[in-house]
Amino acid sequence: MILETFGSRVSCLVSLSLSEVSNCLELCIVTANGYRVYFAFKIYVVIIWSGFLYAKEIETKNTFMDALTNNEKSYTANDGTAYRTSGSALVDLNFSVPALRQAAVDFYSKSKHNRYFYGEDCTMDAVDALRLFITSYEEDPLYTMKWLMYVRHIKLGLGERDVFRMMLTKIGNLYPEMVLQFIIGTELWNYGRWDDVLRIFFDTTSGILHDGLGKVIANQFRRDVIGCGLGDSISLLVKWMPSNNTSSKEKRSEAAILQSLLHLSAREYRKPLSKLREHLEVVDRKASLNQWNAINYNHVPSKANLKYRNAFLKHDEERRKAYLASLQKGDDAVKINASSMFLYDIVQAYLKVDSYWDSSLNPYDEILEQLWNAQEAPKDYDDILVIRDGSGSMYQQLTSNSSVTALSVADSIALYCAQHNKNKSFNNRFITFSNRPQMVDISMCQTLRDKLRRLHRFDDYSNTDIEATFDLILDTVVKNHLPQEALPSSCLIISDMQFDQATEHDDNITVIEKCRRKFETLGYTMPRLIFWNVSVYAHNTIPLQVHPSGIILVSGFSKSIVDMVVSRELDPERALKAELDAKCSIVDTVLQNYVKVA
């Protein structure tokens, strides 16, 4: 009877104070025999309830502090209100890829200049980058490691080499067994390169990780020596192993470490390297030996097609022209490798930079056109309106060791997406904006060069008025009395995210939120929004956290990101995790005994 009465009342206790709980329980046990039982039971409950209320208070305070942190505002370089975080460290990490790339450039001392559009203080340093990564790992270790695989994956992911190495080395110093399992289990060399393994082997401070990777390298080297002797295919390990007779002191030092690992003398190390590289038929080696006519153009890697395109014509003109002619005809026996490259590599190769604010186009280039045409079309890309930022700040360079600009990235993505849009209304059309939005139509352009020439006519390099763009979209449907269905289902905004402040500025509301209210006031729903960050400065200026129609936050330079753009998810974290599950699910199995599922 006592327990039944107590059970019927316990659900109401959560909202009561400690004294009220005590009185309530006194009623529950009034029929108990003896004061001793009553007293002991009451004291026990009071102690337990005190702990419960304290825990509840802490939980409430933590919830408040989390909400306060997530609601913290920041400001763009143009004084627009933004959010400092998306509310998820994993999403913040994924939205900061350009900044992470710059941090890695500094980390590995690869900077060639220190020209920053908004100043170096606005960029992310390596300490901040690693802190963000570790924060994400502590929140969700499994998905953070999936993200790391995605960051490196040359074909399915972002293709970021230095970011991956910096972060994997750091986490490897902290959790060496887990990282060793990650590298071996996911077969890093198949979605990255063998020099990733070598770099971490040389850089790690963990003896466990260093020794474990040493065994991996030594075993692969021995297998390749045997495979070469049998005439079989071998790995690309020797392509990236440093030579011991190079002019670089650092490389000679690293070669000495490998000699010791493999128990070889300097001569014994040099001889198999030369033989194995010859067996690989590496393009760079044949070029350095002036063996141009021995190069099979069908097997030339993506980047080498760009790097040597003029040299091929100069040193092997007849064969090269015949190869290009076969490509133009669509000869099935002839192919060009174009998968392992960034779209901006092709666009940038067409640009001739005359000054910081001025550039022109190089002459028509058949290789650039073929590389562009060979890019695989995205799947299910439909009903998405591209909005490309053409403001002055987009002329910022991606990193301090690159001449590529954020504008070249935006151009390449905008042209690629518009070209492959299955919706006839948006096919080969998109909006560019700066001081004012303009519609760009490239449907009459036959070549990539023609498209770039037309696009550059719309650049005005002034401010970043995204509000005017959505005003134009809204004004169009209102004036023409168009239904909601006439609007695109999604808008893809490719930008550095340094938006101007709203015309009616409010420190607590972002310009995008202002635009959404305008749509709602006039009876429309703002389309789903996809923000694609291409700038080193946007890591702490999140344009939006939630949106009724859905929001996706992406960054980076790979066309594989479009797979996430076409996602039907409405929440940025769910969209990212769905992408990671689709492309990096092997990590679930590889790390099942090494990390906890959040």
Where are these regions (language model features)?
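Long lumenal/extracellular ectodomains of secretory and single-pass membrane proteins
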Residues: 55-409, 419-598
